[in-house]
Amino acid sequence: MLSIFEEYLPFSGKNVNKQDIKDFMETLVKARLALDICFVRPTEYGYALDMNLNEDNDILKKLQMLQSMLYVSSSNYTNYRWFNWLMDVVDASKGIPDAQRLYSYMKEKADEVFPLPSYDTLTYQGDNRYWFWRLDFYIWLHRNEIFDKDSPEMDIVENYIFKRNRSIEHIAPQTPQSNSMMQWDNTETDKTLRDSFGNLVMISQGLNSALSNESYEVKTAHVQSYCNGAKSGSIESLKLLMVHKEYSKGWNKDAIKEHGEKMYDWLKASFEDK
């Protein structure tokens, strides 16, 4: 380690540049500030973010959810891609930045780095997990417009936690059981619809294994058991919650198209949020 410092930042001999050393130490202080106060931290119960603000602060919660979304959509090796966004604001603020300023800048950078792909590319075959997380963030952000204040659904959304261990799965299964009201024709049109954004959610592999190839009716009962408190835990996908909120009576090909178009419109609208 010392040899690396000696090569790139000499601290002894004739090549010492005191200004470079000072700049480096100041950068370390800023990085420590960003990590300790401005960077979301996973906890046993979700995530924590300091910013020297009360945990009930609305903008702090919004910033925490945005960073949580970015955290799960990156790996331990790619967090640096958006850590630099924090450093930019810390540097410009010459200390702890205003939470709203940090949120606005990070949201702007996310919009820039992740442009919305076409609807047709958001398929089962693609690596599109970011867009399911982003949609969940949009639903959480607009929860007061979407859900009734005292509804079980609102309680679920208020306590939603982003998690990494998620995979994209079908709502109406690829090979439905015989008692399912939803059946696929052996056509390219049905195959495309089956694998389209409207018929997909992102859930844990454990839940997917438990409900593998189960009918929509069985999955609806599963979601309802969370809403009425019969099962502990919570819904793993707010997109899935929207499906069962709006299509409690059944899931068919028209519903898949309608839901997919609406959710894609919400993704487009997410770029207008500031």
What function would you assign to each model-found segment?
Residues 1-274:
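Flexible coil/loop and intrinsically disordered segments
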